[in-house]
Regions:
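Retroelement reverse transcriptase polymerase core
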Residues: 2-272
Length: 272
């Protein structure tokens, strides 16, 4: 296994470095994938997708609850100023969210505001400023595991597959009745999110809770869950393919999906 920090270190020092991985052939990239892995991806084509379906997900055993301290609510403040370009982009993205049913119009007495962050490619990412809400929210007691302890469980394994399920946040629902608490306001309208949003405190912990609940019989046997990553580890390729199948089957059972580009195919090393 090679950590991201190790890679950054050797690159900064100008050291010659070689990294090997098994990936899929696509768009003129030379890659290798075993027939067995390709068969699994074909079998679970409704779990590993090029892009996630933009529809409201079903409720799971664990939804994201938002509990506020009694008598407290976020302080009201004036909306952020937006340029004409930002305002047009906001209207566009809100329309897309309405079309997917990720949000719905709201009359809730909350006024959390929208702002924009510029991406590396120059496009705009719409964000909701939940900082004031997070300050009055009762904290989830779930403890994020120490990554060093997770690595201890992987020491005998020789094959690894990593599923990056960050996009899974949009596949988790806000607990019924709590949607109004994350209402965002714009110049003209108010909307409440029906799915878990990235800026909410302990959103990663909620996702970990769901994954640990779903994969209870597999955790510490051949998978570890860390934030929005699932790492499948095995001592042989035969075992690894079987473990991979079991994980994909569980994800299919709960109607949870991953983007294909977020999948690190079976290899003898991976990046956390």
């Amino acid at each position: 296994m090679v950590s991201t920090m190790q890679v950054e270190h050797v690159l900064k020092n100008g050291e010659m470095t070689y990294l090997a991985a098994m990936i899929e052939v696509k768009q003129d990239k030379f890659v290798e994938v075993t027939d067995a892995v390709a068969g699994l991806l074909e079998e679970f084509v409704n779990v590993i997708l090029p892009e996630l379906p933009k529809t409201l997900p079903p409720r799971h055993a664990v939804d994201h609850k938002i509990e506020l301290f009694p008598g407290l609510k976020p302080h009201s403040k004036a909306p952020y100023r937006m340029s004409p370009m930002e305002f047009a982009e906001m209207r566009k993205q809100l329309t897309e969210l309405l079309d997917t049913s990720y949000i719905q119009p709201s009359t809730a007495p909350y006024d959390i505001h929208v702002l924009f962050q510029k991406k590396q490619d120059g496009s705009l990412r719409m964000c909701v400023d939940y900082r004031a809400l997070n300050k009055v929210m009762v904290k989830n007691k779930y403890l994020i595991p120490l990554i060093q302890n997770l690595f201890d469980r992987l020491c005998k394994a020789t094959y690894f597959t990593k599923l990056d399920l960050r996009s899974g946040y949009w596949q988790m629902r806000i607990a019924e009745g709590d949607e109004l608490k994350i209402t965002c306001v714009t110049r003209n309208d108010s909307y409440e999110f029906l799915v878990m949003h990235f800026g909410l405190t302990y959103a990663p912990a909620t996702f970990c809770n769901l994954m640990n609940d779903v994969f209870y019989e597999f955790v510490d046997r051949f998978i570890v869950v860390y934030l929005d990553d699932i790492v499948i580890y095995s001592e042989s390729l035969k075992d690894h393919l079987e473990h991979f199948r079991k994980v994909l089957s569980k994800l299919r059972d709960i109607n949870c999906m991953s983007r294909k580009r977020s999948l690190s195919l079976p290899s003898k090393r991976f990046f956390f």
